[in-house]
């Protein structure tokens, strides 16, 4: 007889930095380093046309119980702006979440200008953008057309942060990339190492550290705030609603204990059929 997985200890108010609502389905980019591809296939159920998303009530109940003040629309294997009910879901959250939460979208920016009215309904945005160079961009995002980041920043009514994955394809461009971002009006930027990356990239070495956030150094690059993010060292915490309705409690999606417990149960069931 199968035993249910041991329950995770309940989270307490003040322990969680933010909540993610995660979308899955066909994407408009084909990133070779997409972390969502490392999740169990059963998790990435297409929910781009589903309203409300699976198990949303449980997420909202936990957001209210824990007093979470930051809610992020993002994806496992797709872009959240491909979700068909984006504005409607924002309205639902704002009606039912009792904390004075801020809402943000973590997007590749491909649809930002076409959906500008919805984009501007968030409180802030983070755009995954690794390079202005189409050749480099294609290596890292799977498509050559580079979104017009300058136009997005200029036309947005909300703060726009840039998230730039760093690897062998763009590391030589980073200084120029930071300068260009600063010139077009970006004020905050995060450089991210791949999860599990052990190489130490030669960047920001002459720039003094001004602070640390969740164990990640923060720099002042001529007025541009730059955080160098290491997924393996960060102390960030999050609550995550996966596309299949699983509510996970690990900031690192691939280490979600709730998913690991489900996988263990499934393997046991396959090894011991009734």
Give the location of each predicted region.
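Distinct, well-ordered alpha-helical segments
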Residues: 84-91, 112-120, 172-180
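Core AdoMet radical
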Residues: 18, 38-53, 66-83, 94-112, ...
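Aromatic/hydrophobic pocket-lining residues that form the small-molecule binding cavity
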Residues: 52, 56, 86-89, 145-149, ...
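Canonical Radical SAM [4Fe-4S] cluster-binding loop centered on the CxxxCxxC motif
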Residues: 1-54
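Short acidic active-site motifs
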Residues: 55-59, 112-115, 173, 189
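Short, well-ordered alpha-helix to beta-strand connector turns
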Residues: 16, 31, 122-123, 186, ...
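Acidic (Asp/Glu)-rich catalytic clusters
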Residues: 62-65, 116-122, 150-156
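Radical SAM enzyme [4Fe-4S]-AdoMet core and its adjacent flexible, acidic
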Residues: 46, 135-150, 154-244, 248, ...
